[in-house]
């Protein structure tokens, strides 16, 4: 329940809310106002060790619970999440800043991830082949790993944790969760509802904190696997450190997603699609459109329409329905984004819409409005770097081939989109673009939870993505049995 009092956030270990054993805390502001809404502990290594011990003890019994029984408990959790959708959305808007509409969409995507986890009995089924040789049968069996952990970012405080712990727990593992210290309140509510669903103590443990918690998770010998979503430098660090300590790691990293706009596109729908992808959730998502490669033939018409519609977008508190662009997560990130806008201007890009100039009264909040650059090239930092904000770069290209070449020059390869009415163009794009997730006239090509989610190149470190069959394979180990009976 949302209140006006400043909350002191706790850890949840072995089925109980407990104070951190450390003394260091960090203030959690509402990004729309700058006012403090909570204090979160920066937990020390000892808290992680307690959580891991609780998870290890719980694993001894939880791993023996029949798979259908685990699934039934997740159905109860799913029901509770659905019953509390409005409250969960409001918590997200309060501590993350995204609009209620965007928050509600995130809640729904999180619920869909739990729906996937409830199907664990089907997803965990192995394989068998009788009589592979004279009187010999072969089969593959899947078993849980043990204690696993998840490290999640601020930008999707509900959806991304729900990619991780429900599926891991459905597979028979126990879990240690470290969510972003910037959005601790939603994590608390997810854990409360989890135990309200009747799960045994210690199956899910929550440790709040920063880098010390991350390092403690990566170095703890009892943790068998780590799931991570965050920025590229940290993802690389998590992958390299976790694997050094013998862990299975999936680390989803940064992005610089491109959209190619063809002359045969539906112009009106393309403009609205690019706006939604680039400026929704204030651009703070790894699937946001950051660059549009528009063909010369339609460039002026597309850009005129895009700029006209973008200037209509209102900036402000996400609780107010009329606002489209909410705040960025922190003042420091706002200053970083303004630095990128200044860089684009200095490098010679044409600033068509300036998000530094906000006409609405947003005093106290961390706001940058929708921003559009034209005349961008590959030598500019605004093309090269992940800005993680409502900043869109436009590059004019001669044809589809040049658009694909431009996109593939990025070190990132998370998502890519083409807007076209040509099946041939779509097939060429699909076959030659280097991206893990591809959209054809789909604004944000993030797949549903029953498909795997992962990028390529510097957007992903690991072998198995989150969700779908990849997720089940990540959270289980297989045993291949060859047997003969006399």
Curated annotation (Swiss-Prot):
EC numbers for this chain: 1.2.1.27
Pfam (any one): Aldedh
Reaction it catalyzes: 3-oxopropanoate + NAD(+) + CoA + H2O = hydrogencarbonate + acetyl-CoA + NADH + H(+); 2-methyl-3-oxopropanoate + NAD(+) + CoA + H2O = propanoyl-CoA + hydrogencarbonate + NADH + H(+)
Q: Which UniProt keywords apply?
A: NAD, Oxidoreductase
Q: Protein biosynthesis as a keyword?
A: no
Q: Which domain of life is it from?
A: Bacteria
Q: Which InterPro entries match?
A: Ald_DH/histidinol_DH, Ald_DH_C, Ald_DH_CS_CYS, Ald_DH_N, Aldehyde_DH_dom, MeMal-semiAld_DH, MSDH_GmP_bac
Q: GO molecular function terms here?
A: malonate-semialdehyde dehydrogenase (acetylating) activity; methylmalonate-semialdehyde dehydrogenase (acylating, NAD) activity
GO biological process annotations for this chain's record? inositol catabolic process; thymine catabolic process; valine catabolic process
Enzyme class name: oxidoreductase
Q: Spell out the catalytic residues.
A: 286 (nucleophile)
**Acyltransferase among keywords:** no
| Pathway stated in the Swiss-Prot or TrEMBL entry | Polyol metabolism; myo-inositol degradation into acetyl-CoA; acetyl-CoA from myo-inositol: step 7/7
Q: Which positions does UniProt annotate for NAD(+) binding?
A: 154, 178, 181-182, 231, 386
- Assembly notes: Homotetramer.
PANTHER family the UniProt entry points to: MALONATE-SEMIALDEHYDE DEHYDROGENASE
Function according to Swiss-Prot or TrEMBL: Catalyzes the oxidation of malonate semialdehyde (MSA) and methylmalonate semialdehyde (MMSA) into acetyl-CoA and propanoyl-CoA, respectively. Is involved in a myo-inositol catabolic pathway. Bicarbonate, and not CO2, is the end-product of the enzymatic reaction.
**Sequence similarity:** Belongs to the aldehyde dehydrogenase family. IolA subfamily.
Q: What is this protein called?
A: Malonate-semialdehyde dehydrogenase
Q: Could you tell me the gene encoding this protein?
A: iolA
């Amino acid at each position: 329940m949302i209140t006006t009092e400043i909350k002191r956030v706790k850890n949840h270990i072995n089925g109980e809310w407990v104070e951190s054993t450390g003394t260091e805390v960090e203030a959690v502001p509402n990004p729309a106002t700058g006012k403090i809404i909570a204090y979160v502990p920066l937990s020390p290594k000892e808290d992680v060790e307690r959580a891991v011990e609780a998870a290890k003890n719980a694993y001894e019994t939880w791993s023996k619970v029949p798979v259908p029984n685990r699934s039934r408990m997740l159905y109860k959790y799913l029901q509770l999440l659905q019953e509390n959708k409005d409250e969960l959305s409001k918590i997200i808007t309060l501590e993350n800043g995204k609009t209620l509409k965007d928050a509600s969409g995130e809640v729904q995507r999180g619920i869909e991830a739990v729906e996937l986890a409830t199907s664990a009995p089907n997803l965990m089924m192995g394989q068998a082949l009788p009589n592979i040789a004279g009187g010999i049968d072969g089969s593959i069996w899947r078993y849980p790993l043990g204690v696993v952990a998840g490290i999640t970012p601020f930008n999707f405080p509900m959806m991304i944790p729900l990619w991780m712990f429900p599926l891991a727990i459905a597979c028979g593992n126990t879990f240690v969760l470290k969510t972003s210290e910037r959005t601790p309140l939603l994590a608390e509510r997810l854990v409360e509802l989890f135990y309200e669903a009747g799960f045994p103590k210690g199956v899910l443990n929550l440790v709040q904190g920063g880098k010390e918690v991350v390092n403690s998770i990566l170095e703890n010998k009892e943790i068998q696997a780590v799931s991570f979503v965050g920025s590229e430098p940290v993802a690389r660090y998590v992958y390299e450190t976790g694997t050094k300590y013998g862990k299975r790691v999936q680390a989803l990293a940064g992005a610089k997603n491109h959209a190619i706009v063809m002359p045969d596109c539906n112009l009106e729908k393309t403009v609205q699609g690019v706006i939604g992808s680039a400026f929704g959730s204030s651009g703070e998502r790894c699937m946001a459109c950051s660059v549009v490669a528009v063909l010369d033939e339609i460039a002026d018409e597309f850009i005129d329409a895009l700029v006209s519609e973008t200037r209509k977008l209102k900036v402000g508190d996400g609780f107010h329905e009329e606002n489209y662009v909410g705040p960025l997560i922190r003042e420091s990130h706002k200053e970083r984004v303004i630095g990128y806008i200044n860089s684009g201007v200095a490098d010679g890009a044409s600033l068509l819409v300036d998000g530094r100039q906000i006409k609405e009264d947003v005093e106290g909040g961390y706001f940058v409005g929708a921003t559009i650059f034209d005349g961008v090239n590959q030598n500019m930092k605004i093309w090269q770097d992940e800005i993680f904000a409502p900043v869109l770069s436009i590059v004019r290209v001669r044809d589809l081939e040049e658009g694909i070449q431009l996109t593939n020059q990025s070190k990132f390869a998370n998502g890519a989109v083409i807007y076209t009415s040509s099946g041939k163009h779509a097939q060429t794009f699909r076959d030659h673009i280097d991206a893990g997730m591809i959209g054809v006239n789909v604004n944000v090509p993030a797949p549903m939870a029953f498909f795997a989610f992962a990028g390529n190149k510097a957007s992903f470190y690991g072998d198995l993505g989150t969700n779908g069959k990849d997720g089940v394979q990540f959270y289980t180990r297989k045993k291949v049995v060859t047997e003969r009976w006399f």
